[in-house]
Amino acid sequence: MLALLALVLALAGFSACSGSDEPGATQSPGVVRVAGGLISGTEVDGVRAYLGIPYAAPPVGDLRWRPPQSPDSWEGVRTCVRYGPSCPQPLGDGLSFFPLGETDEDCLYLNVWTPGAVAEGDGTGGAAEGTTDGAADGAADGAAEGAAEGAADGAAPLPVMVWIHGGGFSTGSGSLDVYSGIGLARLGAVVVTINYRLGPLGFLAHPALSAEDPSGASGNYGLLDQIAALEWVRENVAAFGGDPENVTVFGESAGGMSICDLMVSPPAEGLFARAIVQSGPFDSSGAGMDAVRPLAEAEETGRELSRRLGCDEAPDELAALRAVPVGRLLRAAERTVPRGPGGLGFVPVVDGVVLPGDPAALFAAGELHDVDLLVGANADEADLFLLGMRGATAAQLTRYVRRLYEPDDDAVLELFPDDEHGSRKAALSKAVTVMGFLAPARFAAASVAEAGADAYLYHFARVPPAVGDLGAFHGLEIPYVFGNPVLVLDVTGGVDGELSRAMMRYWVSFARDGDPNDGVGAAAGTGSETASGDDEAADAALPSWPAYDPAS
């Protein structure tokens, strides 16, 4: 049971790496020039990894609750072989299965994985010579020469996949072991994972913050971080062999919700061509969660937090709030925001600027960016959320349903009767899964297709033996997408290995040109085409995946 609980917590996004190097990494002198200066990374299984790259200035002090700023430049070559700190988040001792490792407000870092064969044109030779004798100029010259050599080779730029992690907008990190991009990079993609501000640091609105900002709004600092990371990718990913005009954002849970927000956000337009949304509906009311909040409501929450912290009577309220130690801020925030059954607290804000309206309504109206979409959910999403209700009585579960779905609770109980699902708990799990995840995923696919872009819909139903009596719960698909084992769940061999390789190939093919049915063997006749040349990865051609038809 402990192993199962640990697996569930890991996939729910509660565990982050402690800032260590990639397993099996050997330090490489390969040097790449990015905004800010020169960086070197590591090589793991033939893939170059650059970890802990700053994409924005530390959002600390006076930069707390401000849009992300450009990072400071540095002299010489910055060694990027360790993950940066995760963003502060409220994790208690009860989750000691996975120590979070280092957290810090200085957390706006990203990680890049790129196939070594592509990254060879990064100035390795000249850079190594330059850094050996301490000459930064030599490193820069080497980088330029290497880049020119890479361009001369005529290698086509690779598709770029940017992962936005989940965690209810309050927990998580881009540096989880399960998010390592090695496997996807070996299939021919440049993979980027990012951190963004969470909880009250990422999504606090307050009238004084709105008045201070030229836009007249506040509350979407976490989304602005994601946009800043995408801008960094557009400006720098070519140095890693990636195509800045061929970027796919993909994410799960709150990461998927974020992507839906970005698909209707004016500042994000043009920063990505495709999106993959895993179990991240833009409208999560069917799961008892408010994925966005109106600005006025969010500002009132900010007022209450300030009162709770004793900052509302200060001569300079914002200065007082910015001086509050982060631990105290997080504890006060947990007491300030009433959490519904779904568990979301601080969330993105409909501010009229970053989010011009409710994303669900904008999708329905076709007011979204021209972005191809691959979207889906798992067969038993809610089994994770109901894990703590194993011993609940039918009466307790009924009260939960009524609280979750009022004033439509009677209709829900009628639509999902116990006798059709075996028990009240099974019926509740199906209700939350269908209304909170499966139906919104289908609606998102239909909205995109009706707007004229391509959409593909999936349904993940695999239940590996390692999960016991749980079904295909929320987050279970993540190890399959990245090809990374998690504790007792091994996705590298057997049936689960085959499924993982298939999903990875579909995902990378979609990232390449918006069609999962080509590129790395996802269509008949192309089954042997893999970037890695790995016989195990070069399975037979996968079944054809038809585009979503709203009429179906």
Question: Where do the model's predicted regions map?
Answer:
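Short, solvent-exposed turn/loop segments enriched in Gly/Ser/Thr/Pro and often Arg
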Residues: R197-P200, F250-A254, H459-V467, D534-D549
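Surface-exposed helix-capping loop/turn segments at secondary-structure junctions
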Residues: T114-G121, V237-N246, C311-P315, S447-Y456, ...
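Non-catalytic accessory segments of hydrolases
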Residues: C17-G130, G142-N220, L489-Y506, A511-V520, ...
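Serine-hydrolase-like catalytic core of hydrolytic proteins
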Residues: G92-A128, E149-A314, V353-G388
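Bacterial N-terminal signal peptides
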Residues: A3-G13
